[in-house]
Amino acid sequence: QSGGRVASDIRAQRRQVGIIFQQFNLVGRLPVLTNVLTGLAAELPLWRAVLNRFKTEEQARALDALDAMGLGEQAFQRASTLSGGQQQRAAIARTLVQGARLLLADEPVASLDPESTRRVMELLLALNQERGLTLIVSLHHVSLAQHYCERVVALREGVLVFDGPTSALTP
């Protein structure tokens, strides 16, 4: 909004926000690359998005995002063949292709094993530190927040109980 009015470039504004869900929201029968390319859907003509018609440069962008997530070799596999951690990394790659500057991550590691959790959290941290992306992450494990986050906003039954630097949290 601007002065109480919806901004004229609202679609461009929406593309700046990527969402990473607890459930990965990948289409299992489609290749990982195609799933990642769906991050471009908002900027493509409808017919191209529906028919999965992507330009070479768009595919290169998606392959770069998959490489950044350590999934370059899995690009042409069906998404259903990936482990949970790999699926979450593919979902993160989808937001990178989208060009998001703000990532909202809703319990991104809730259903992952400890090693996959570590890897996903380290990738999210790297996106923040190396690419300057802003991250808002919902977590239920305080230890993860203490290890990977600079600031914590804690709620209990919908009431704010803490808002400050991670260093101010006590175990």
Regions found by a protein language model. Give the residues of each.
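Conserved ABC ATPase signature
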Residues: 78-82, 86
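ABC ATPase NBD coupling module
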Residues: 1-18, 48-56
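Conserved ABC ATPase "signature" region
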Residues: 44, 49-74
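Helical segment within the ABC ATPase nucleotide-binding domain
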Residues: 118-131
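H-loop/switch region of ABC-family ATPase nucleotide-binding domains
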Residues: 139-140
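Helix N-cap at the start of a conserved alpha-helix in ABC-type nucleotide-binding domains
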Residues: 114-116
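Catalytic Walker B motif of ABC-type/P-loop ATPase nucleotide-binding domains
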Residues: 103-106
